[in-house]
Amino acid sequence: LSKVNVSMSKSKSAFFCQNCGHEAPKWLGKCPGCKEWNTLIEERTEKTPKHVVSFSKSSSAQQAVLIQEVQKSEESRIPLQDFELNRVLGGGIVPGSINLLGGDPGIGKSTLLLQMAIKEHLKVLYVSGEESEQQIRMRAERLGLDNPHCYLLTETNLQQVLIQAEQIQPQLLIIDSIQTLYTESVESSPGSVVQVRECTANLLRFAKQTDIPIFLIGHITKDGTIAGPKVLEHMVDSVLQFEGDRHHIYRLLRSIKNRFGSTNELGIYSMQGNGLLPVANPSEVLVSIGSEALSGVAVASMVDGIRPLLIEVQALVSSAAYGTPQRSSTGFDVKRLNMLLAVLEKRCGFRLAAKDVFLNIAGGIKVDDPAIDLAVAMAILSSNADLAID
């Protein structure tokens, strides 16, 4: 009975913010950390002895050294055959790094990393908590299985995953997804704030001690942010965002955070039946080339990060069939569209108040660069006058 009491005394209940991970001893309507309302949920945690986390490969106590005396690492980046992912990561995968990939459901996150696992000539351990081994094998064959050293593991227990990783010693570890993992040291369900934080901390420690790079797939919330505590993005070395419209074939890979490279790089993929194909010249596929010039179409040049792109702006202007004119935009901010229409009406004298205006950015990409405002205005005026732009 005394042992039971001791065991139960080691567990406690606390409230954690789902947005930023702030811990509070009781429920609060407003989070003191991020100032958001109704984001605190109750989690049961287990009190474990707190140890100092060291990323050194030796267990002895560390002494402070001069920065000039620190030996440089001789290990270089691991280059990838996927030149778009290679570009976004800054030239390849850094050994011992931990990378987080987020994106909408069904956008292609698992496909991108599974493709990397089966096509790169590396020893890879692919851990999935969402699919069976048979399902992954079927997808791998469709994508073109070309790696005899790709290991599959369907497991959600983090301790078992780390044991397998220590035995196999892969050159790359992929976790699909971090929200499905759980550690036995925390008494809460997988995907909770505490579980995501503790699992990521253990994986981070493992990566730094073994120099095995890790890729994590993270789910996102309704507002587009990665699910889990905000501290998750601070713990990892890079945060990659995979975005695009599921009804279009093109996908964009952006680097939101990168400790080992630039965050201005952009990768573009085309979703085909045999997987995600890198697009070397995106301007060639984002702009339609036809023999007949059409009204309401304008081509603009823009820079996304440090990558120049040519994009096609398509506009349709017609008389309002109903009382209130409609304003619709795909890939472009509708508030900015309304502002441009007001400028054309007020300063340029074009009567557009009684017109329906529909705007689309070809290719399904989202653009927020103000450099295309002129192209948007010209496409609208071209459609209104039914005159093609030469």
Identify the role of each PLM range.
Residues L1-S7:
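Short, Lys/Arg-enriched N-terminal segments with co-localized hydrophobic residues
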Residues S9-K12, F16-N19, E23-L89, V94-L100, ...:
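Peripheral, non-AAA+ core regions of ATP-driven protein-machinery
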Residues D104, G129:
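P-loop (Walker A) phosphate-binding loop of NTP-binding proteins
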Residues V124-S128:
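Conserved RecA-like ASCE P-loop NTPase motor core of nucleic-acid helicases/translocases
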Residues S132:
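Conserved Rossmann-like nucleotide-cofactor binding loop
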Residues Y151-L153:
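General small-molecule cofactor/ligand-binding pocket signal
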